[in-house]
């Protein structure tokens, strides 16, 4: 199964590279990263691949390129991936996935930087945010080629911490119980 990773990069999501770095040299993997990825290249890659992994910043309306704040993926692009297994790792991706009935593992609000933690009044420091980010991405990297339901189970079982408020918050936003 051919897999496409789309990651509109910016410094605040560099930690996400853990998810796909080890797969960069595989023949059945395509990785699109950077800023301002042309939509023609994205659409062509969406058609040519069987599984799609979206990574970065976003809203319930889709995946953003934080540089320039333009949407890279929206409901207008569903025709290219609606019937494919997808992973949507961006803030409130679960709303997007549920609204469009996708076969997806999708994150809810996902605190990955200090400003987001402050917005949600989470008492934390950068070390705990980094620990949360790394834990989540390492687990997702190990199961990213699985069925979305199995990814959800693996994340729910592995992405835990009794002492990290960021992990606890992110788990709650994904609908996991402790």
Describe the function of each predicted region.
Residues 59-82:
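A short, glycine/acidic-enriched catalytic loop
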Residues 13-15, 61-69, 95-99, 114-116:
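Extracytoplasmic/secreted cell-surface and envelope-processing proteins
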Residues 93-178:
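Active-site-proximal C-terminal subdomain of hydrolase catalytic domains
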Residues 47, 77-79, 97-100:
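Mature extracellular/periplasmic domains of secretome proteins
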Residues 81-85, 102:
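A short helix->loop->beta-strand "cap" motif at the edges of active sites that frequently abuts
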Residues 54-56, 66, 106:
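Short glycine/serine/threonine-biased micro-segments
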Residues 1-55, 87-89:
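A domain-level signal for caspase-like cysteine endopeptidase catalytic cores
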Residues 10-11, 37, 58-61, 92-96, ...:
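Solvent-exposed loop/turn segments at secondary-structure junctions
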């Amino acid at each position: 199964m051919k897999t496409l990773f789309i990651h509109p990069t910016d410094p605040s999501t560099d930690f996400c590279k853990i998810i796909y770095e080890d797969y960069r040299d595989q023949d059945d993997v395509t990785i699109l990263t950077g800023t301002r990825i042309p939509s023609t290249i994205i659409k062509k890659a969406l058609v040519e691949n069987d599984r799609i992994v979206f990574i970065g910043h976003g809203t319930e309306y889709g995946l953003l390129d934080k540089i320039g704040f333009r949407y890279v993926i929206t409901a207008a692009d569903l025709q290219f991936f609606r019937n494919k297994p997808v992973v949507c790792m961006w803030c409130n991706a679960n709303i997007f996935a549920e609204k469009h009935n996708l076969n997806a593992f999708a994150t809810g609000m996902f605190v990955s930087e200090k400003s987001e933690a402050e917005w949600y009044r989470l008492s934390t420091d950068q070390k705990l945010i980094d620990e949360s980010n790394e834990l989540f991405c390492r687990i997702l990297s190990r199961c990213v080629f699985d069925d979305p339901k199995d990814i959800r189970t693996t994340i729910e079982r592995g992405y835990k911490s009794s002492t990290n408020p960021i992990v606890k918050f992110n788990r709650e936003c994904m609908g996991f119980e402790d």
